[in-house]
């Protein structure tokens, strides 16, 4: 067997994913009639001598020397024939040193997974800009995660929720041009602002309002604007009689707001009309077995969709930020098993559609929106990211589905970017009309630094992160302060 790979820093794509290439038999110096990796992949189990005896018969060549090679590799790697185990640093180093041999053994699942990640890394080294290498690999990994789920679960349709599902949808559709999965895609314009009034079918349901949004980040006037679709004509006058309309609420006045609005401001007939408007928009997009995708984080929109449409749906989100989704009754799956350190606006601004944010629905089921202007930096990153997705699709084609890698690993570069460069790249984030602001949850605008008070006491944040945290809080309440600082 030829050692043509050696320990090159950057392999070409065909070398990196040798298992998927038609000329692999030539590079491995085997019989011209035998595609050994594809042939080897048909046999599973621990009885290697028997497997290689049968392989030799099929290939018409003596392949028994490879049996000992694979046995030694398995012994060193401790790779079971029909299972998956995480790699240690020592095993990963061994993989790098023995890359050429490992490409021939498709039974070594962890090796295949490693090769898939190496293919992504090789593409990233073509262009190390954050849009291409970081955001591009992130979109590709999320789209491949969804593609595998679609194939495994047989969804008839995947609906991507606006607006942070837009570019994941674009990536999924670009990959599906070569994967050809029998699935339809849709784009559902919904937001926290549009969905908020739909969570109060009855006046008594308003008691849950403080649990749905951070009311202390609002004034009675701003909160009434969010509840306008279900508010009576005299709601403002009733609130103004007892509360200062332009002063932020505290823990006491928020309950006064709930009491007053529930007794004097809620209009059940307007709710029925608004629900009818929303159903007219949503129902045509949810038929059969469906899946939805959203970045996160608490399944608020998905819960409303399921209640209004009664559809059989599974929600796919990047991660959750509390245990609230587990109490909502909507089946869901997450890409990340834990919440990342940096999320919310820091993540979403790179995924947002260059279009209007949804703020409601009219009587004809049409969407009401409010436009924004994304920063030129973010727009360029999004363009570069889609180039990465297109390059992966064009390079590997339908074989993408056979590329074993953990999507979480493919997202690592973007997570690193969020830690180190997102604030600089997203300095113009205040230009965006963010869905977090629209949904009445100003805390969503803060950067997600996942530490509880107890964790901060045991492991204090570094100075640079504390400064970032303070800057993020200023951004939530005074966007212009960031511009002045920068």
State the predicted function of each range.
Residues 38, 57, 75, 82-485:
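Long, low-complexity, Lys/Arg-enriched
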Residues 1-4, 484-486:
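Non-Sec secretion/translocation targeting segments of pathogen effectors
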């Amino acid at each position: 067997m030829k050692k043509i790979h050696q320990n090159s820093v950057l392999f070409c794509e065909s070398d990196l994913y040798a298992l998927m290439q038609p000329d692999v038999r030539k590079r491995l110096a085997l019989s011209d009639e035998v595609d050994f990796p594809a042939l080897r992949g048909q046999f599973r189990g621990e009885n290697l001598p028997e497997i290689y005896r049968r392989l030799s018969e099929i290939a018409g060549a003596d392949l028994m020397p490879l049996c000992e090679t694979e046995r030694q590799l398995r012994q060193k790697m401790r790779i079971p024939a029909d299972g998956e185990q995480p790699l240690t640093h020592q095993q990963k180093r061994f993989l790098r040193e023995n890359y050429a041999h490992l490409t021939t053994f498709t039974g070594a699942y962890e090796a295949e997974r490693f090769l898939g990640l190496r293919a992504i890394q090789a593409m990233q080294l073509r262009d190390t800009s954050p849009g291409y290498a970081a955001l591009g690999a992130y979109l590709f990994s999320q789209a491949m995660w969804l593609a595998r789920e679609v194939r495994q679960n047989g969804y008839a349709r995947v609906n991507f929720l606006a607006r942070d599902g837009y570019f994941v949808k674009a990536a999924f559709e670009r990959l599906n041009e070569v994967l050809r999965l029998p699935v339809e895609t849709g784009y559902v314009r919904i937001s926290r602002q549009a969905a908020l009034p739909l969570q109060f079918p009855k006046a008594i349901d308003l008691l849950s309002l403080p649990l749905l949004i951070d009311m202390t980040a609002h004034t009675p006037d701003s909160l009434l604007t969010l509840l306008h679709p279900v508010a009576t004509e005299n709601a403002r006058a009733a609130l103004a009689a007892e509360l200062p309309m332009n002063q932020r609420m505290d823990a006491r006045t928020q309950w006064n707001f709930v009491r007053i609005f529930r007794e004097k401001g809620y209009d059940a007939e307007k709710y029925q009309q608004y629900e009818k408007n929303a159903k007219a928009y949503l129902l045509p997009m949810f038929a059969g077995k469906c899946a939805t995708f959203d970045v996160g984080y608490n399944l608020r929109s998905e819960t409303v969709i399921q209640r209004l449409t009664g559809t059989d749906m599974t929600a796919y989100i990047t991660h959750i930020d509390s245990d609230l989704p587990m109490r909502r009754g909507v089946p869901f799956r997450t890409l990340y098993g834990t919440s990342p350190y940096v999320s919310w606006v820091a993540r979403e601004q790179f995924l947002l559609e260059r279009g209007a944010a949804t703020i409601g629905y009219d009587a004809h089921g049409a969407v009401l929106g409010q436009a924004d202007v994304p920063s030129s930096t973010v727009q360029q990153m999004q363009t570069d990211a889609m180039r990465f997705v297109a390059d992966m699709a064009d390079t590997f084609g339908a074989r993408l589905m056979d590329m074993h890698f953990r999507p979480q690993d493919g997202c690592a570069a973007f997570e690193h970017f969020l830690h180190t460069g997102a604030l600089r790249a997203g300095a113009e984030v205040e230009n965006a009309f963010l869905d977090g602001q629209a949904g009445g949850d100003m805390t969503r605008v803060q950067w997600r630094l996942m530490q509880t008070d107890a964790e901060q006491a045991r492991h204090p944040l570094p100075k640079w992160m504390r400064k970032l945290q303070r800057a993020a809080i200023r951004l939530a309440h005074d966007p212009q302060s960031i511009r002045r600082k920068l």
